[in-house]
Every structure is written in structure tokens, then in C-alpha cells.
Amino acid sequence: MLLSNQPANTKPQQTPSPSQTQNFKSKLQQQIVSAAAAAAANIANGSSHHHHHQNHHHHHPLNNHHNHNHNQHNISFATDFSIAAIMARGGNAPSSREPSERSLSPASVERYSGQDADDDVDVDVVDCSDSEMPSATAAAAAAATTAAAAAAALQAQQQARQALRVAQQQQQQQQQQRQQTHHHATTGKQQRQHHNHHSSNTNNSSNSGNSNTNSKSSSQRGRSAAAVGAAATPSPPPPPPSQSPEELERLSPEESPAQQPTPKIVGSCNCDDLTPVQCHLETKELWDKFHELGTEMIITKSGRRMFPTVRVSFSGPLRQIQPADRYAVLLDVVPLDSRRYRYAYHRSSWLVAGKADPPPPSRIYAHPDCPLSPEALRKQVVSFEKVKLTNNEMDKSGQVVLNSMHRYQPRIHLVRLSHGQSIPGSPKELQDMDHKTFVFPETVFTAVTAYQNQLITKLKIDSNPFAKGFRDSSRLSDFDRDPMDAFFFDQHMRTAPLRFFPDPLMSQLTPQEADAASMALLEKARQHLQMFGRSPYTEMLLPHLYQRSAAPPPPPPAPHLSAFQLGMWQQQWPQLTAGFLASANQQAALALAAAGANRTPPPSMAVAPPAPATPTSSCGSASPDLRARPQLNHYPQRFSPYQVPQHQASPPASNRAESP
């Protein structure tokens, strides 16, 4: 019979027999089993099975059997197996029986839609009755829904596991890239990165275990889908480890990545007339060498001079508004930053040790030649070689007071002095006058009480001609070594027992031997005096030190000086000609005789010289009189290679009587 939309109680109800009930139950069980199998097969096949049935339906449009199967598979594939949909179907089953019955009946139900909702459906009255059909159909729908939900949960679990494996592989690749990027970082940073890397791996493993545990239950399919979406998008790299302020202070300004750049001190000008004036650092090449290593300047209680020295020159239009206008060149040293430093010997670099100490009152050092005229300022090189650095805050001699282990920047000020103005002595007075400030970044230095960097010490010894105290002698901490060395040298030269060539002989040899070779040889002999001043050598050894004999003399009856074998000394020292010392001795004897007779000696000797006034040596060559020691008292001054010969006074009467 046909089942229409009319009420079912319009026809008389028939009581089913027991045999019909048993047949209906067996058929219902078969339908449930077949429905579950069909639902599982549809879910496994997916879209391929759907496309296959679409093509099959296109080739057989008039076949009702294929059309019926196609509608049935479409219903199964389009079914939503989410939790919300299953609960909605379960809640609406008692109120609206037709959608659930018609959508899940495997044998005799067509596809239900809004357009054919009023169509009649053929129902076998013999197999079922109105009283048993609703409950049996609901049970079949519940069983099919449960089977489909189980199959969907199994598939979602597999997809979630695959997504987790992909996410773990991506995380491992990102970790390898981060390790390669930070391979050249410092040891401290590598340790912190290793710690963060280990903690991130622990969190990832715990999250992976939780995700696997949650994906096993069918009630967490929504979280699994979210994990799949998160795996498709690569996670951003973790932020770099944050550094504490204490760690930043331990790093040097050049090595701290998060630290702000060192503030740079720039020049200034408050006068338009001084704007085109330029200042040039004369010793820029030497300053650049020290700046690459980190310049250090010694400060002491008594004050120490700067090396390299600040030497500048000026160029440009130095205008003179009034005839009385003059210029002054000033120097001051200002702190570069507000930090105190320490030197790390194991790293050979300067590190920040903390905040700076309170700065002493700023002082301005004026050049001693100031004030200068514009013409003199253009031609003159202004050298601040006399400025001294000290750490004595009670100093009253005008020295620049600095703090040890702090960085400083020297500045040059060009001040125009009008009529009635004096040289400023403080920064406050400088601001009230027309001036221009020049800054050279290569002159930055660190004030120290002892050199920290060994390369700086070596460079200063090699570059500073007054650094002999570092090579030789004692450790003088509170005294300036340059004046001490000058004092020792002066005392040594005053008491030197040996002079190669006396000054009367030099005055006689200089006009005759005016060629460059002879003068250079004499200067070399004078320089050797510094080496042999404290040695017991006398003038008798001069022939053996400076002369190589051409032929050995005949054997004398007694031992003589020619028997000495000086070896390498004879080959290293500059050699003189064979007759140079003999003629020098003759000229010395003539000079002494002329001084005794108060007359000028002849310029040259054409005849054989007279017998020497002094005893001759065993080798036959005349030697200077070793007993004439009082003659040396007339020349106690220190030797200079550019000494001008002075007029010799006549010797005393005692010397006249002794001379022949």
C-alpha cells in the first residue's frame, strides 16, 4: 500500500503475529549490519567513490537501480559526523522521525530533500506494522550513527598523528637552523641558548605527549583539527634570550649588541667669522696607530706629559676685525661617557666596570705662546707638549686633573680675543667669548696609572724618543723618567775620563777636512763616546778599535798593543786610513805647542814632524799625552753633535813651563 501524509490511524490496526515479529527482527538485524558496512566503506573510499558514482550515474540516467544506489552513497558521504550534528540528530529523532528514517534506511528509502518532502514512498505492509516500525527504525539509525562516528574518530586520530609528526619535523629543522646561525656567538650566549633550547625541547615533548593522549578520545577531534592547522603554518622562531643589566655592564661597548652606541662629542662654533677656519691634527698617523689598539695615558701625582702629543695647525680666513684682535688656542679634556672601565687580560679588551666616579672640576690649558696674531697662527704649529695629566685634585700648577680608568676626549678651542679680553680659565668663561671647538675622535684615550695593554707599551717605546726609562732602568712610579735620564746623562758626560778627539784638534781638522765623509766619521767617533765612557779603555786602544793594519810590523823586542786580537770589534767598527791617527797626533802636538807659544800653528806640515813631546808607544805611533788631565777641565759641558767651537784661552803658567 502507499504511505501518504495522512494520519496513520485512519485505517484499522492489525495485531502482528509472532512469526511476523521474528521475521521483522531478523530482517532488521541484517539491515543494521549492512548499513554499518556501507557507512564504513563510504568513509574509507571518500571522494573517489563519489566521483565513480557520479560518472556511473551520468552514463545510466534511466537506470533506477543505479540512481537509487547513487542517492544512497550521496546521503552517506554528505552526512556530518561531528559531535554537534550527531547530538542534533539524536535530539530531533523523536520529534521529526522522517529525516532520520529516510536518510539512514538502506533498502527502501530515497534521498530526502526540501523539494521532494511531500512525495509518497512505497512501504511493504507485510514486513512491518505501524506500531513496530518507529522503534525499529530509530534503533537502526542509532546503530548506524554509532558506527559512522567510530569510523570518523579512527580517521581523525590517524590524521592527528600524522600532523604531529610533520610538526615535530618542522620544529627540528628550525632548531638546526637556529644552531647554525648562532654558531659563532660567544661562550656565554651559547650556554644561555643551550639552556633555552633544552627547555624548549622539554616543552615540545610534553606538548606532543599531551596531544597524542588527547587525540585518542573521539571527544577531542576539534583540538586535533586545530593542531593540523597549526602544523601547516610554521611557528615563529623564539625570541633571543634577554640579558640582565648586570650582564650588559660587564660587556665592553664594542661587544654589547643591545647597548646604545657611545655618545660622540662633536665640535661647535658660536661665531660666524670663525666658521670657515679649519684645524688639522699634525700627528694623525701616529694617533691612528694608538687608536686602533686603544690609547692609554699615564696619570701621576706629579703629572705626566701626553704621548702622542697634540699638535695642531690652522688654515682658513682668520679675520681681524680690529687691529688689537688676537687669538688664543686652548686645550681641555672632557669625559667621553659616564662609565668606569677595567682591562680584561684574558680577552685583551676593555670592559665596563660600573658607573663613573664624580668628575673633578674641569680645567682649560692655554698654550704658553698665546695670544697669537693671525699671521703667526697661520704659520705656527701649536704643540701642547708641556701639558701634564694628573690625578691630584689638589694640584695648583694648572695641570689637567683626570680619574683613572675613565675614557676622555681632548678638545681644541680657538678663541678670538678682543681689546680688553683675557684668556678664559674655565668653561663658563669660554662660553661668553667668540670661539670654535674642534674634536678629533682618534685622540680618545683611557687614563691609567700603569699601562694595561702590552701592545700600547711597546708602541710607545718604539715611537717615543724619550721612553728610554722603560727599556733600561728602574721602576720610577712617582717621578718623571725623562728628567731623571737627562740628569744621569749630564752627570756621566761631565765625569767622562775618555775623549776621542779634543776640541783643539777638532778646530784644526774641521777647516782642512771639510768633505762630508770626514765629518760623518768624526761625528760617528763622538757618538761612540756614549758606549765607552764607563769602560777602562784609553786612547792607546784607538788604533786597534778603528784601524786595521795593512801589514804586520816587525816583531818588537817587548810585548806591545798590536798583539791584542779584538776579533769582531775590528771588523764592526768603522775603519780609518793608515795615516789618519798619526797625522791627528801630530796636529794635536802642534796645537799644544802653539798654545804654549801663544801663536797660531801652520795649516799643514810638508816636512817630517818633530819628535813628539809625549812618550811614544811600543808600536811606534805617537800617542796623546795622557798626563795632560788639567786640560780637560776647560770643557765640562755636556756633549752636543752640533756644538760650535769656542775660542780657547791660553793655558796657565804651570802648563807653559811643562810644555816644550
UniProtKB/Swiss-Prot annotation:
Compositionally skewed regions (Polar residues) per UniProt: 1-11, 23-33, 643-660
PROSITE patterns (alphabetical): TBOX_1, TBOX_3
Transcription regulation is among the record's keywords: yes
Name under which the protein is recorded: T-box protein H15
Subcellular location: Nucleus
Gene: H15
Basic residues bias (residue ranges): 48-71, 180-198
Record-level GO cellular component terms: chromatin; nucleus
Keyword Signal on entry: no
SMART domains (alphabetical): TBOX
Organism annotation: Drosophila melanogaster (Fruit fly)
Bias-annotated ranges (Low complexity): 12-22, 35-47, 93-108, 169-179, 199-233, 614-624
Lineage: Eukaryota, Metazoa, Ecdysozoa, Arthropoda, Hexapoda
Region listing for Disordered, in residue ranges: 1-72, 90-122, 169-266, 598-660
Compositional bias segments (type: Pro residues): 234-243, 600-613
Residues in the DNA-binding region annotation: 286-472
